[in-house]
Regions:
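Hydrophobic positions on the alpha1 helix immediately C-terminal to the Walker A/P-loop
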Residues: 20
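Glycine-rich phosphate-binding loops of nucleotide-dependent enzymes
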Residues: 130, 141-148, 158-159
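Hydrophobic anchor at the beta1->P-loop junction of P-loop NTPases
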Residues: 7-9
Length: 172
């Protein structure tokens, strides 16, 4: 993977990863991938299919077999269904940490992330552990953080149906 030039942007929810990653990708003319949207897509597929997020084997199979498209404009298509709005909603938000803790799901998403970068010769990728686990040799690694108050305010703006207080408690 040494010929793949990745800019890895990491940080907690609401720290500005997506905003910065999109701006860097646009400015540098590079592809952009929100890896968190990938995990949210698996959670969406599970919930949409009536599968409990903690059913590790079934969720891992969903991750391996789902068709996933994440466009540069943020449109997310999961198995032919536009999930752009739903993956940011409260139901998926509650389920995604369970799904993302599944080692087989992580293995599949990591493989898809590496494949995405290899097909493009690199790009700007944002998400948790992108610079430590997925691309430890990334050309540039950025870690963003913000105060809990700023993170909660940013996240509640992203998810209009969540109150500031609910987001603050989820981020704590």
């Amino acid at each position: 993977m040494t010929d793949v030039q990745v800019i890895a942007i990491d940080g907690p929810a609401g720290s500005g990863k997506s905003t910065v990653a999109r701006a860097v990708a646009a400015r540098c003319g590079l592809g952009y991938l929100d890896t968190g949207a990938m995990y949210r897509s698996v959670a969406f597929a599970a919930l949409h299919g009536g599968v409990a997020p903690d059913d590790a084997e079934v969720v891992a199979n969903l991750a391996r077999n789902m068709e996933l498209s994440i466009d540069p404009d943020g449109t997310v298509i999961v198995d032919g269904v536009d999930a752009t709005i739903e993956i940011r909603g409260p139901e998926v938000t509650r389920a995604v940490s369970i799904v993302a803790a599944n080692p087989e799901v992580r293995d599949e998403m990591r493989a898809r992330q590496r494949r995405w970068a290899a097909e493009r010769g690199g790009g700007v990728m944002e998400g948790r552990d992108i610079g430590t686990v997925v691309f430890p040799d990334a050309r540039l690694k950025v870690y963003l953080d913000a105060s809990p108050e700023v993170r909660a305010a940013r996240r509640s703006k992203e998810v209009a149906d969540l109150s500031y207080e609910r987001v603050a408690s989820d981020l704590a």
